[in-house]
Each structure stands twice: as C-alpha cells, then as structure tokens.
C-alpha cells in the first residue's frame, strides 16, 4: 500500500467518528426512544406498555445502533495511529487507548442487542422486559471505565506531543481527560431511580453524553485535519515526479 492510499484510509477512519455520532443519535436516541430514556422508576406494566407502544421503532433503532456502533472501531484505530506517532517506540498510552476503544465498541453494539431482545416480544412478561431494560442500561453505563481509559490516554498523549505542529490543541487534550474523569458519578447510578443521577437524569444522561460527544467530535475534527494535511503534503511531493513521467510518456 502506498503512503497516499494509507492516508486516504486514515482520513476516512477519522471521519467515522462524525458518522457514528450522527447515526447513533438517530437510531439509538430517536428511533430507540432514548432522548431521554424511559424512567427507571416506571413499573413493569408501564414499561412493557411503553415498549409495546413503540415496538417497531425501538426494535429497528436498536438493531441499527448495534450495526453503526462498529464505526467506533475505525475512529479508535485512527486515534491509535496518531497517538503511536506521538509516543514513538514505547506506545503504552496507545495500547491502553486501543483496548479501551475496542471494549467501548463492544458495549455500543452489545447493549442495543439487549434492548432489541426486550422489544422482541411485546406480549412477554412485563417483569422480564423490565429486567432486560435494566440490564441494558446498567451494563451500558457502569462499564464506563473502558471509555474513560480511552479518553484519558488520548488526552495524555495529546499533551505529550512536542512537535512543531501538535495534532491536538491543548484544550482538546484537556477536554479528553475531563471527559474520562467526568464519568465517575455513573458509579452511583444504580442507587437512583429518579433525579440527576438516574440513567435518564440531568447529570448521568444529558451532562455526560454531552461531554462524550464533544470529546469525540473535537478529536475527530483535528484527526481529520491532520490526515488531510499529510495527504496534501504527500500529493505535493509526488506531483513533480508524476508530471515528469507524463511528459516523458508524451514524447
């Protein structure tokens, strides 16, 4: 593979972060009726009624969310390429980031599958539907550390970039670290069925998903800019040679 081809793939991988954010918000958030999610304080019959009322939308949304969750993988891969370039021969932060990213992708795909199971049979026992819904949200949230280590490792690597043109502005790296640490309140989420720390609350849902999406978007923007710049430079290097070859063939 040529350097130019590799850089094209890197640019595409960086842009997968934007596609993930948009598509996951549409499928899991809008179609899955998770903007915000149903209250954890709902009774089993009320939750079963909610799932039955929105049966097709919830099933479709979560099936599609399980699919588009894979977009986290190429975005993570490109972030690891950038970090490895920064770290050099001992890329411990890169390894932490790529493992955290792989596990995050698993959660982004596996948890919607659980909600799809909950929606699969509208006539199922309401207690089973509620248990599956609980499993999905608790698993989705309290495994936050896999994403925290990814964000923190990326932020630390960004701050360690001593090149003349760092890939990430310092505020982006600090925001990544802040994002990873901001998930800590989720540890208390299972103890609350109402209020800001419930899974549909102001902190646990709106606040933390907000920091997460800003982190993904900001790092994605600068990764795409970096790949575009390197691709442009690679094209400029080869342009004179390609011109000479074209002139030689025309003679």
Model-predicted regions and their roles:
Residues 1-251:
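Hydrophobic, aromatic-enriched alpha-helical segments typical of multi-pass transmembrane helices
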């Amino acid at each position: 593979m040529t350097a130019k081809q590799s850089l094209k793939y890197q640019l595409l991988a960086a842009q997968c972060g934007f596609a993930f954010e948009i598509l996951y918000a549409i499928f899991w958030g809008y179609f899955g009726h998770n903007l915000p999610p149903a209250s954890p304080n709902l009774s089993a019959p009320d939750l079963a009624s909610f799932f039955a009322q929105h049966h097709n939308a919830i099933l479709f949304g979560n099936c599609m969310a399980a699919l588009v969750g894979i977009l986290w993988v190429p975005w993570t891969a490109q972030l690891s390429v950038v970090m490895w370039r920064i770290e050099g021969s001992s890329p411990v932060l890169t390894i932490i980031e790529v493992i955290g990213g792989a596990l995050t992708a698993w959660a982004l795909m596996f948890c919607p599958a659980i909600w799809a199971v909950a929606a699969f049979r509208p006539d199922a026992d309401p207690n089973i539907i509620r248990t599956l819904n609980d499993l999905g949200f608790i698993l989705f949230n309290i495994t936050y550390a896999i994403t925290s280590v990814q964000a923190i490792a990326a932020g630390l690597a960004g701050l360690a970039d001593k090149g003349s043109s760092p890939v990430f502005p310092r505020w982006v790296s600090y925001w990544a670290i802040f994002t990873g640490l901001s998930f800590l309140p989720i540890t208390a989420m299972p103890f609350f069925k109402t209020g800001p720390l419930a899974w549909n609350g102001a902190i646990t849902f709106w606040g933390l998903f907000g920091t997460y999406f800003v982190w993904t978007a900001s790092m994605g923007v600068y990764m795409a800019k970096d790949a575009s710049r390197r691709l442009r430079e690679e094209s400029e290097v080869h342009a004179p040679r390609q011109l000479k070859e074209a002139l030689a063939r025309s003679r």
